[in-house]
Structure formats: structure tokens, C-alpha cells
Amino acid sequence: MKKRNISLKSKIEIQKIFKEGNLIRFSNLNLKMFCKSNHLIYSRLLVTFSKSFRGSVKRNRVRRLFKEAFRKRLELLEGRAIDIIFVVYYDRLDLTYFSIESLMKSLVLMV
């Protein structure tokens, strides 16, 4: 699958997911996840941050980690077209690749 198919970019679709999507909170990681099934044949991802999340370098690193973990778990989501939005709230949070990978594993089981 091409990289551009993974990203969720339409403002209208993003607002629809925030309104109609299922909310899952991960209180130990200070992050929320919104998910909703879509009309496409593949799943898409968006990682967004609160305004209190400072530092573009750290923000982009966390975004890259989420996208890579999602890309690796994409074959487990085959047949289930889902739009997923992660909202990260705390910039002092120490998100490692392994914690994000385990989060994606649990996501696949939940969905």
C-alpha cells in the first residue's frame, strides 16, 4: 500500500470522526483515540496533538513512531477499513516505540 493512502487529511472527514467516532481513552498514556469505519478498502491514521504539546522535533518524532507502528500492523487490519485519530495531550510523556507498538497490538484486538 502506498504511504499516501495511510494518512487521513480531509477536514470534513476528520470532523465527522470526532463527532460520530468511538472514543477510547488511554489514561496511563494521556492520549485519546477516535475510530470509525470508513467506505474505503484500507485503514487510515491521523496523529494530532494538543496545543500544550511543545517542540516540533518531539511532536514529529511521536508522529513518525505512530505511523511506523500503524504501518507494521496494517496487514492485521486487512478487511476492516477504519479511520483512526490519536490525540496526544502531554509533551513530557515518554512515548517509546515499544509502548506505541503494544498500543497498536491492543488496538487491533479492540477493533
Swiss-Prot record:
GO terms for biological process: tRNA 5'-leader removal. It catalyses: Endonucleolytic cleavage of RNA, removing 5'-extranucleotides from tRNA precursor. Consists of a catalytic RNA component (M1 or rnpB) and a protein subunit. The gene is rnpA. RNaseP catalyzes the removal of the 5'-leader sequence from pre-tRNA to produce the mature 5'-terminus. It can also cleave other RNA substrates such as 4.5S RNA. The protein component plays an auxiliary but essential role in vivo by binding to the 5'-leader sequence and broadening the substrate specificity of the ribozyme. Keywords: Endonuclease, Hydrolase, Nuclease, RNA-binding, tRNA processing. This is Ribonuclease P protein component. It comes from the Bacteria. GO terms for cellular component: ribonuclease P complex. InterPro entries: Ribosomal_Su5_D2-typ_SF (IPR020568), Ribsml_uS5_D2-typ_fold_subgr (IPR014721), RNase_P (IPR000100). Its EC number is 3.1.26.5. One of its GO terms (molecular function) is ribonuclease P activity. Belongs to the RnpA family. The keyword Nuclease applies.
